[in-house]
Amino acid sequence: MLILIVGYVIYSVVTKAGAIENAKSVLSYPQAILGMTAIFVYVGVEVTIGSNLGEYLKETEGLDASQISKFVSLFWGSMMIGRWTASISNFNPSESLKKILIVVVPFVAFSVVLIANSLYSGDVTDLLPYSAYIGVMILAYFASKEKPVRLLLIFTALGAIMTIIGVMTTGKIALFALISGGLFCSVLWPSIFSLGTAGLGKFTNQGAAFLIMMILGGSIIPVVQGKLSDSFGIQQSYLLAAACFAYLFIFGIIVQGVLRKQGIDFDKEVVKGGGKGH
């Protein structure tokens, strides 16, 4: 049923993706409808990965509550790592300094996570291999060139790949792959929000309000994963998270086409505006 609903939304949007004249409401804009579904899915996947991680660790690793906390903390810390990285451009550093900071800041943030966990959990040496996943995020960020659509496509593709790795493998590789979903979720909100409200004109504020309403996905998608976990097991239930990342990837492709039909090439507009798409 969910697949049918998503398919209908995409079909409806694509069929009216041309230039909009005499729009009577924000819902006349395909990008707004797509943005609403994307925010719903984005918040849902962000919350579901973190909220079900404790159960995953109990079932697959046999850990108790005192051991679980540092891994859950690492997931939410990953959100911080990504957001600190994305915020660098807001300080207007020179290009050479920015490149250095994009490499250094994520590991500074990771150090903060490690220190905080060491104060509570003691030994955190088993978290150190996660630095490899941070390295992947840094390379992805450079590859995105800070363009919202490009960043969205790269990060959602990696999020889907890492989640599938988490489902198909075992041990720390699987665990860290799932936790890295936090890294690849961390910078999606501003990209989705910017794309969903692009070209809305006088309806921009209304569109923003509609998008914010869709954070209710964070209360629905985790419940769906819980039901899947009951039927198929907690590890397999994370395929739902992979599907969410895949939908966000598709959103990026479709909304870019929708905006171009309206005469808006979003990534080019960002470059003209100084490269600060988020």
Model-identified regions with their sequence ranges:
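Loop-to-transmembrane helix entry
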Residues: G62-G77, K99-V104, G122-Y130, N205-F210
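Intracellular juxtamembrane helix-capping segments at the cytosolic ends
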Residues: G50-L53, S186-K202
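Interfacial helix-cap and linker-helix signal at transmembrane-aqueous boundaries
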Residues: L57-K58, S89-N90, Q225-G233, S237
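C-terminal transmembrane helical hairpin of 12-TM major facilitator-type secondary transporters
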Residues: L97-I192
